[in-house]
Amino acid sequence: MVESNVESGNAADGASTSLFAEEAEPTTPGRGQRPGLVSVADAGRRKPTLSTYLPILGVIAVSVAVWIAARWAFGRHEQAGPWSVAAFAALAGAAVSVAVRPMMASLCALVQIPVRPTSRPIVPAVATAGLWFGAVMFAGGDAILPAWLTVAALSVWAAWIDHFTLRFPLPLIRAVTVSGLLLGAMAVVVDQDPASGLRAVVAGAAIFASYLVFAIITRGHPGLADVRLSFILTAAVGWVGWMNVASAVLLPNVLAVIGVVVTKVFGGRTVRGVEFGFAPYLVVGTALAIALPAGWWML
């Protein structure tokens, strides 16, 4: 396991912060408060309004539309159909990613996280396009597709923000989790597959608990923000199978170790300890765990 974000303090609807990177956007410090730091009380008072989350409804609507198109295309068994829908999904994913950028900026500003990463939407848009393309090709017309698409679109932004700031808004984690669970429940009903739904929830809860225990033992590695995000990401993998869940535990940590080694050897910068955002590795590792053959790591 590798070091990652460490949540130094969480208030309701506050920001998940790094122990080594507490600096937030400049605020007016009170007596005894260091400049640039936001108190837990201040973060706790900043609660997003329901209107802040409206763009997520758009993400869900587009995800469902892509699923309907995929269900129709894969049902016709025409070779060109799935590829056309996957290409459409990629374009839709990129558009959705750009469309939710203002919401991401609002959530970051609300809890005093630097909003600068949200001004760079190209990489999240390209990453979301790739994930949506792959999700359509893998899931086809299965009803789990909207859940995967929605979780992917929102998680990519969480990873992007975490990469630059070593934190991301707790309201964003809650939005990803709630959206994923609701759409997952829809998939259980539509596909009449309670076994996959139960496996997804159990897998998410088990890995969440494992990460939490490890974070407590190591005093914050991985960070509690990553622990929270791991639940819905592992649940997404759990829908596929237990061997994929094992990959979802292994891959993020392997990728993170590789990332740290590359940074130390070729990065040309000195870091204090190991300071990096773990969410990007969680997202990439989750996608690979779904896409790769089950049990590939046993070969």
Spans of model-derived segments:
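A membrane-topology feature that recognizes alpha-helical transmembrane segments
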Residues: 1-299
